[in-house]
């Protein structure tokens, strides 16, 4: 178990690195609403939803998951997804962490297991509720997140692959990398954070696949962003995350299809393993890589 002192230090460090939370939800043409009756919520995760005025028929859904020290309303204010939803007509779900530090549980057995009763279970139930409530297209559900939210994005893609068509990961770690052998909820794993959990694509794939035993259906395509000078979640985590999804999709991690310099912008390098996996490494960028909303829209198929 982390001591209270260490937890305080970790929270203080993260607070200094992440965006401040807006005092009030930004005014947009739609409105952010809190939903409390979306179904089973075993860990008390908050649900906020943005439904655009320009709601499409059979709309898509984007689940946007905040960083440590964040909240659902904070990520609504500090990201582009609500504005983009007015352009493309999709619904945005903003989960909100139930923990005092604002991080996500990506460490307990419950959250790392399909229908295990952890944070991932609560977020999955938000998705199924929204599909039912708004007649959303179940084939157009996407997940994205920054830092701790990026970690949870990988966890959601591993634990509920049937729910998502694609994901974008902004400065996270592999699904299962923060696993706590003491089953700690919302635990910090310095070994993983510092890039010292290194293994093979096959092993990483087995970790992800074990989160939903027996599942053999489709899995979301993944786009992984990370910065070269990240000192919170070290750059090695980029390579390990790409290994994991290369292993899941059966790509040869050591032989990508192509590498494109200065893509999608100067000092960013995009590596493509196949239709289902891209890695984007940002030279000179720390924690976290800024959200590339337009590129997300392309990856999700809205643009």
From Swiss-Prot:
Gene from which the chain derives: axeA
Family: Belongs to the carbohydrate esterase 1 (CE1) family. AxeA subfamily.
Annotated NCBIfam families: esterase_phb (TIGR01840)
SUPFAM superfamilies: alpha/beta-Hydrolases (SSF53474)
Catalytic reaction equation(s): Deacetylation of xylans and xylo-oligosaccharides
Record-annotated disulphide pairs: none
InterPro entries recorded: AB_hydrolase_fold, Esterase_phb, Plant_Biomass_Hydrol_Est
Primary location class: secreted
Compartments where located: Secreted
Sites carrying sugar chains: 189
One example GO MF annotation: acetylxylan esterase activity
Broad EC category: hydrolase
Physiological role: Acetylxylan esterase involved in the hydrolysis of xylan, a major structural heterogeneous polysaccharide found in plant biomass representing the second most abundant polysaccharide in the biosphere, after cellulose. Degrades acetylated xylans by cleaving acetyl side groups from the hetero-xylan backbone.
Species in which this protein is naturally found: Aspergillus niger (strain ATCC MYA-4892 / CBS 513.88 / FGSC A1513)
Gene Ontology cellular component annotations, sorted alphabetically: extracellular region
Active-site annotation: 147
EC number: 3.1.1.72
Secretion signal span: 1-23
GO biological process: cellulose catabolic process; xylan catabolic process
Keyword entries, A-Z: Carbohydrate metabolism, Cellulose degradation, Glycoprotein, Hydrolase, Polysaccharide degradation, Secreted, Serine esterase, Signal
Assembly and interaction partners: Monomer.
Protein name: Probable acetylxylan esterase A
Pathway: Glycan degradation; xylan degradation
């Amino acid at each position: 178990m982390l001591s209270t002192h260490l937890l305080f230090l970790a929270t203080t460090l993260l607070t200094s690195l992440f965006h401040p939370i807006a005092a009030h939800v930004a005014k947009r043409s739609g409105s952010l609403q809190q939903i409390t009756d979306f179904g089973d919520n075993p860990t008390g995760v908050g649900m906020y939803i943005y439904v655009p005025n320009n709601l499409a028929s059979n709309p898509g859904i984007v689940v946007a998951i905040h960083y440590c020290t964040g909240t659902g309303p904070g990520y609504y204010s500090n990201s582009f997804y609500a504005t983009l939803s007015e352009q493309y007509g999709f619904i945005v779900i903003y989960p909100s962490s139930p923990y005092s530090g604002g991080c996500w549980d990506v460490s307990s057995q419950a959250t790392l297991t399909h229908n295990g009763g952890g944070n991932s279970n609560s977020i999955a139930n938000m998705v199924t509720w929204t599909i039912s409530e708004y007649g959303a297209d179940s084939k157009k559900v996407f997940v994205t997140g920054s830092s701790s939210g990026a970690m949870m994005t990988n966890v959601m893609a591993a634990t509920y692959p049937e729910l998502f068509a694609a994901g974008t990961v902004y400065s996270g770690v592999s699904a299962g990398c923060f696993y706590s052998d003491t089953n700690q909820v919302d635990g910090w794993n310095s070994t993983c954070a510092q890039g010292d959990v290194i293994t093979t694509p096959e092993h990483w794939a087995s970790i992800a696949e074990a989160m939903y035993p027996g599942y053999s259906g489709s899995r979301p395509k993944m786009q992984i962003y990370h910065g070269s000078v990240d000192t919170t979640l070290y750059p090695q985590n980029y390579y390990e995350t790409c290994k994991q999804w290369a292993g899941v999709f059966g790509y040869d991690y050591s032989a990508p299809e192509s590498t494109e310099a200065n893509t999608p912008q100067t000092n960013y390098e995009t590596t493509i393993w196949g239709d289902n996996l891209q890695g984007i490494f940002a030279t000179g960028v720390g924690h976290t890589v800024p959200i590339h909303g337009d590129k997300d829209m392309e990856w999700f198929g809205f643009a």
